[in-house]
Amino acid sequence: MSSLQKRPGPGNSSQPTERPRKESILDLSRYQDQRIQATFTGGRQITGILKGFDQLMNLVLDDVEEQLRNPEDGKLTGAIRKLGLVVVRGTTLVLIAPMDGSEEIPNPFVQAE
């Protein structure tokens, strides 16, 4: 029998190769300890204080409140459900927005009835 030798190449390296660290798409560090709003796939919305995040956009939020929607038409009801400390998975996020320094405006593309 012949002995097999490892050849250098991808997957056969005995030493770990150093890769550049992946950066996050957004720099959320400036919103650390500030209240933000997050919208998820499916339309759910929460607000909370950003306590931590990683490069995959997973978030840790504290003092979280969910804005409840009407199940029939999907419009916000004005009711709020307190959730406390929440870990949000980055793959479910659609929108992240700071609460301070922003205001809601009417959609300019919707025709007035």
From Swiss-Prot:
Residues 1-23 are annotated as: Disordered. Residues 23-102 form the Sm domain. It is found in: Cytoplasm; Nucleus. InterPro entries: Lsm7, Lsm7/SmG-like, LSM_dom_sf, Sm, Sm_dom_euk/arc. It comes from the Eukaryota. The keyword Acetylation does not apply. Residues 1-17 have a biased composition (Polar residues). The keyword Ribonucleoprotein applies. One of its GO terms (cellular component) is Lsm2-8 complex. Belongs to the snRNP Sm proteins family. Component of LSm protein complexes, which are involved in RNA processing and may function in a chaperone-like manner. Component of the cytoplasmic LSM1-LSM7 complex which is involved in mRNA degradation by activating the decapping step. The LSM1-LSM7 complex loads onto the 3'-end of single stranded RNA. Component of the nuclear LSM2-LSM8 complex, which is involved in spliceosome assembly. The LSM2-LSM8 complex plays a role in the biogenesis of the spliceosomal U4/U6-U5 tri-snRNP complex by accelerating prp24-mediated annealing of U4/U6 di-snRNA. PANTHER family: SMALL NUCLEAR RIBONUCLEOPROTEIN (PTHR10553), U6 SNRNA-ASSOCIATED SM-LIKE PROTEIN LSM7 (PTHR10553:SF5). Component of the heptameric LSM1-LSM7 complex that forms a seven-membered ring structure with a donut shape. The LSm subunits are arranged in the order lsm1, lsm2, lsm3, lsm6, lsm5, lsm7 and lsm4. Component of the heptameric LSM2-LSM8 complex that forms a seven-membered ring structure with a donut shape. The LSm subunits are arranged in the order lsm8, lsm2, lsm3, lsm6, lsm5, lsm7 and lsm4. This is LSM complex subunit lsm7. It comes from Schizosaccharomyces pombe (strain 972 / ATCC 24843) (Fission yeast). The lineage of its organism: Eukaryota, Fungi, Dikarya, Ascomycota, Taphrinomycotina.
